[in-house]
Amino acid sequence: MSLWPDNDLTTRLGIRYPIIQAPMAGASTPALAIAVSTAGGLGSLGLAMHTQEALRNDCATVSAAGAPYNANFFVHSEPVDDPARAADARSLLAPYYRELGLGEVPDVVTATPSFNDTHLQAVLDLRPPVVSFHFGLPNADAFKAIKAAGLYTLSSATNVAEARELEARGVDAVIAQGFEAGGHRGTFSEPYERGHVGTLALVPQVVDAVSIPVIAAGGIGDGRGIAAALALGASAVQLGTAVLTCPESAAHPLYRRALNEARDDQTRITHAFSGRPARGLENRYLREMAGHEAHYPDFPILNTLTGPLRKASAIGNNTDFLSLWSGQSAVMSRNLPACELIQLLVKETESVLERLATAR
């Protein structure tokens, strides 16, 4: 008899284990998604920053492997045109540009489009088995078209109100993103501080509030965390930081080393890289930019302006200006191939479930 709880979600997703690899735009790869799905989980592609050609190529690569996968997109609001904040940001970044020999800070541009008609057409053409969204859901017509195509949909919520709104819009399952999670907060309500709810508290409240499956995310790094999430009523878990040190990820070697050396108290929520709140490991840039939040332009404008800093830092082999996105479970990172990591997580989870089942 299986130790895993009965789960309609795994059946619907076509996976053996209720373990989903977080999309992580910029760090996910087709190789990572294929490895996770081959091992029985659900691999994901973070496509928010992809060109159309790269988007279609990556989806085709994973699809050709015959494994289920999740295609993820950002659904952010269009940035507000604020010349004063744009000028402030350029002034703040200018010393770093000079230090790294990058010349003048470029004019403010938007280089990461929100989910749009071009993305929609790609989704309808490629038909990924699962389509997920961060920062809310697309407009009603686009979302209706995705649902009409029979694609399974996910979106992130950082509090109960967001989860209820997603269910009301017709999403198939909600990702309950606890405050411990690394990377961008999926919040789409204001102020974002309403999403400062830890995974242990958030998951059961969301489970009680909605009738759709709930996927737990945030601070889950081993089998103990997976078993705990299932005990709280989650139908599955989503892990991001745990897979960043897998060789199949696109994480820079310095990024991997920082994760391996991380402490439990080393992450911070910051707007300084992108203009949206995101959790990452503290470095020089985060320390020096602290307190300047009022001067940051909206996402994704600031993300575009800091892009050259991140690239130069990687080329220069230092972490001063890298966005080291990480959850609070980084200390649990293992340097294993993704397939081996999933197998280990399954073994760890089953060990915990067996111990709990036989406890007196």
Where on the chain are the PLM-derived regions?
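Conserved active-site-proximal phosphate/metal-binding subdomains
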Residues: Y96, H184-S189, E193-I215, I220-R360
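Active-site entrance/lid segments in N-terminal catalytic domains of soluble metabolic enzymes
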Residues: M1-A209, L345
